[in-house]
Amino acid sequence: MKNVLFSISFLALTMSLASSPMSALPAVGGGVVPLKEYPAPDRSHIPAFPGADGAGKYTSGGAGGKVLVVRSLKDDGSEGTLRWAIRKKGPRTIVFAVSGIIELTEPLKIHNGDVTIAGQTAPGDGICLKNYTFNIQADNVIVRFIRSRMGADAKRKGDDAMNAFQNHRNIIIDHCSMSWSTDECATFYDNSNFTLQWCIISESLANSIHEKGAHGYGGIWGGQTASFHHNLLANHTNRTPRLCGSRYTGKPEEEKVDLFNNVIYNYGSAGAYAGEGGSYNFLNNYYKPGPFTATKSSYKRLFTAYADDGKNNNVKGVHGVFYFNGNYMDPTCSSLTDKQRQDMMKVNKDNTVGLVVSGKFAPKSELLSDKPFEIAERSTLQPAWDAFESVLAYAGASYRRDSYDCRIVDETRKGIYSYTGSHGSSLGIIDQPSDVGGWPEYKTAEVPADSDADGMPDAWEKEHGLDPEDASDSAGYNLSAEYTNLEVYMNGLVNHLYPQK
């Protein structure tokens, strides 16, 4: 009887361990219970990573492909550099064995898609790009935990810190920090299945070197199903954001954009505007006028709508249609007057009051929808005030948030500014990176041993029952039915940087 009970118990234990997605474990009587081997899933229905949301949610990037390790901060294209890894073709995941500033010698362009850039894998303080724009011209791209702080040292007279506007699809940019552009910091339009989420977009350079003169713009946003959520835009003179509309496609029926849970601080001039053609949701965004905003008539505007001038591909007069709900204007900045606060409270009571029709080309009623547009999944929608706290806690390259982003978050929370420009800008608007002390130092740290260069540290592989001498197990589905073993490791580093349900 004892032998029978032991056999039943042993069988039950073996079946339990074999069905678990966890690591290989010692079995009763010695030996090892083999790892579970899940079949490769259909990635078209699996989020890019836990926390991915919006139109680009199901981007697969380089999942299951080669692992390329960046070991050098040089930008000469040699093996081991970021440019070398980006130029490669085929599915690939780019991980980092170094931290610091990469001083780009020319624009960094992704021409070959099916790629994941996992900035969170960098040891120490992480990666920061300098001098030139980071441009995406490919399909199926995931970029996470990268900083692009361009500056004006390279004398680029009208460049963005990061952009993608070449009619591509399946792109998600997550937890990145963008600043010090000479044009816009973050410009993304005319792409489909696109998400920009959990990013800090701050301090574009105003009186710098743009060929048209003063700039300092946040970004141009849009897309044929695009989502922009949980981003912080801070300290820009304008374009927070400009909505591109269907100016270049001539297809307003295809322009569909979701903007939710964004935080916009210390904006100026027109603030958010344009949208010449398309359908737009503005849901639960948090507007916080700062000292610069208090000097502008835009302090009480959620959006200023434009009609198309007919100079590109739209018919003249085309305009967007907008749905507003749950957006909140924070009246706590000490620079605001009582009258300004009263105006803002009217917008909080009725968001449609915050829509301005430029030139009065049509009655406001023609621009308003009474129900939200069905655009993309929106599983992380929060009330505006909760989103404010979440964005300040988690946005940007926050695996190790640098001193620059810490300052921006602090200013946003307190409704203050710390610096003025060296060429005439003021109230938190800057002209050169040196106005705020320049680039922070990004220290590296000891790189965990990774004998097979598969992106997973040896110690982590052993802990999870993988083989630190077998590079092929990075692409296996042993620890999860949805994500490769490498993805489980990379996601595990940063899963805490999203609101916990």
Language-model segments: what does each one mean?
Residues 7-16:
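Bacterial N-terminal signal peptides
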Residues 25-63, 401:
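N-terminal pre-domain segments of enzymes
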Residues 47-94:
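Acidic Gly/Asp/Thr-rich repetitive segments characteristic of extracellular carbohydrate-active
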Residues 67, 91-93, 99-101, 107, ...:
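Detector for repetitive beta-architecture
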Residues 102-225:
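Right-handed parallel beta-helix
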Residues 242, 247, 253-434:
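Extracellular beta-rich repeat passengers
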Residues 434-501:
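Extracellular calcium-associated, cysteine-rich motifs in secreted modular proteins
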